[in-house]
Amino acid sequence: MSYQQQQCKQPCQPPPVCPTPKCPEPCPPPKCPEPCPPPKCPQPCPPQQCQQKCPPVTPSPPCQPKCPPKSK
């Protein structure tokens, strides 16, 4: 048998397994800029302080003409 024939009788070798191609790393998601802080509202005006309630007006007693003391 020639050398070539003998080689042919060898069981076929499975084709070499190709290593799976290494995928490139997926791109990281784009970095979003920091969201704007909410606009700072001006301080709300403090509630207007109500004016002090006037004390109820006491009706002045009816005028009594003051009689001058009678001189004796």
UniProtKB/Swiss-Prot annotation:
It is found in: Cytoplasm. Disulfide bonds: none annotated. Signal peptide: none annotated. Induction: During squamous differentiation of epidermal keratinocytes. The keyword Glycoprotein does not apply. Sequence repeats lie at residues 21-29, 30-38, 39-47. GO terms for cellular component: cornified envelope; cytoplasm; cytosol. Residues 56-72 have a biased composition (Pro residues). Residues 21-47 are annotated as: 3 X 9 AA tandem repeats of P-K-C-P-[EQ]-P-C-P-P. GO terms for molecular function: structural constituent of skin epidermis; structural molecule activity. Coiled coil: none annotated. InterPro entries: SPRR2. GO terms for biological process: epidermis development; keratinization; peptide cross-linking. The keyword Repeat applies. Residues 1-11 have a biased composition (Low complexity). Belongs to the cornifin (SPRR) family. Cross-linked envelope protein of keratinocytes. It is a keratinocyte protein that first appears in the cell cytosol, but ultimately becomes cross-linked to membrane proteins by transglutaminase. All that results in the formation of an insoluble envelope beneath the plasma membrane. This is Small proline-rich protein 2E. It comes from Homo sapiens (Human).
